[in-house]
């Protein structure tokens, strides 16, 4: 075999230039960058050194051969031509990895099979010995990459991916791979800061990946020093003496690094379940003297190095996945920015994020940004210098005259990030509405009401108050609106709401309203199960702001519920499409002789049962799980007061066909009116904006539209929110 080899090093997308720089420093020559990889030339000692020292590579591949191919036979022949006896014993084990497609190879499994067959056929001897496949821990791992008709055949010297350092056996919900964490640290300038004796703190450290990688860089510890099994361990071309030399050098450097006074490296994590796993990872890495992890919230983050040294604050905030997370993430970033401005003056900061637009909400100008990929997710690394001249809040200070004490230049109180002009206008509108509607709500003893409903077209939101919580619904923007501008306006609004209303950011819940299909509007969106009790007209009701698109209480129907409460005394009440039966609770409060509530959803009937029980109402209030149309066709009871508030559109596995309120309302009302007792009243309402009541109904029944009477002041701005009718028998 030659003394010089072509090496191919793979890495996460976006790390190519960093890896090229690192590999050059470790001795790789003739370096060229490719997508998610680099290549170059090196001797065996450099190959070993890259394996043990690369903080950024996934794999180190030793290229055996490059050859062109047009079909599967060319693939077989090219692999078979290699003298495999130089690499693998006849009775050894191998694994084959194949990537790419073309030249008649459209299936990677088929390609890997052809490579394996060529190797096995080459090594099969007269005694019948032949290599076998071992996917987990083979003697050699062969890799073939097919790229535009060229096959690149390699041996994987690394074995398992080099990002698997061996210390992180316990991880959190959204782990950052170790080599990506190392790349972020390098881009953030940690090697320079560490060389100067600086500190490092992570306010959301999870299980400590940034902390361990930072300590290994600072202590000059090779990231894969503790790896026991390599891709070259059983390779026949392995040179043990050369490997021992490289490994011993790395061992000596690690011992020297650990003998130095440790730097101040600290992590803080709010989730108590991650504290011990993080500490276990630190101990496995042998860095217990260098790294400490404590439980702590971002809101109380305040690094205090023992010698008052400055350094780097680094963080990978969580990514929002659930309904409503966008609001909580916005406030998390704002909180992080506030803590940096208040407690980390003079430090540098690095935020690795999948939501870079939220970085603008931190109140500090980012002086440099780098693009990365976390798997398939595009991310940005935002770098900050925590200095007053970089602040974009009310905290920016005028230049101090010479001789002024340094402490006077440090902000002593955290102020919110400065609102944009548009956000300030939005905040002013909220405060104006609050002043007007708040008086009415207090007078009527109403806990929950709509404060804002797209009053300003550019801020297409509905903002509802539920006691001291805010429920925000974003209306889907038309396709003609630039999504980036719509997103920026949403973030402006979310920043303004806590300031305008004087509430905690943690009490703002965001949801996105768009055209719903089928039962999607009733699907569970999260699993927090957080119910809270609210009051309406002397009735206690349960709402859930987080788990579903709707909250369990349709605020626009408040006047209708109050009307039902006033009219229900001594009557038999029927509530069709009852949802969480809030109207039923009002009827019971008003003295109804009996109530019957029908809905197809078990979830909402369980909720209805809780609403009734919360008010002390017994089983005489019947709850029926059924398709409303089917139930009406089979029911023969009479009712004095009926309320129907159907969805615009509905389907379910439990019902036959699809309900369409425009198409089916005549049949629905005829069935319901057949159950109405003489002198009784049926109230019919729906929220379909294009709805037209069939004129034939007016010939059969006494019909009166009462839409204007069913709107309270909080919905007066949107008189098309619903339409309502009062029907009686002729």
Curated annotation (Swiss-Prot):
Primary location group: cytoplasm
EC number: 2.1.1.173, 2.1.1.264
Keyword annotations from UniProtKB, A to Z: Cytoplasm, Methyltransferase, RNA-binding, rRNA processing, S-adenosyl-L-methionine, Transferase
THUMP domain span: 46-157
Region Disordered, annotated ranges: 394-418
A GO term for molecular function: rRNA (guanine-N7-)-methyltransferase activity
InterPro entries: 23SrRNA_methyltr_KL (IPR017244), DNA_methylase_N6_adenine_CS (IPR002052), RlmKL-like_Mtase (IPR000241), RlmL_1st (IPR054170), SAM-dep_methyl-trfase (IPR019614), SAM-dependent_MTases_sf (IPR029063), THUMP_dom (IPR004114)
Pfam families on file: Methyltrans_SAM (PF10672), RlmL_1st (PF22020), THUMP (PF02926), UPF0020 (PF01170)
Catalytic reaction list: guanosine(2445) in 23S rRNA + S-adenosyl-L-methionine = N(2)-methylguanosine(2445) in 23S rRNA + S-adenosyl-L-homocysteine + H(+); guanosine(2069) in 23S rRNA + S-adenosyl-L-methionine = N(2)-methylguanosine(2069) in 23S rRNA + S-adenosyl-L-homocysteine + H(+)
Kinase as UniProt keyword: no
Compartment annotation: Cytoplasm
Family that this chain belongs to: Belongs to the methyltransferase superfamily. RlmKL family.
Record protein name field: Ribosomal RNA large subunit methyltransferase K/L
Gene: rlmL
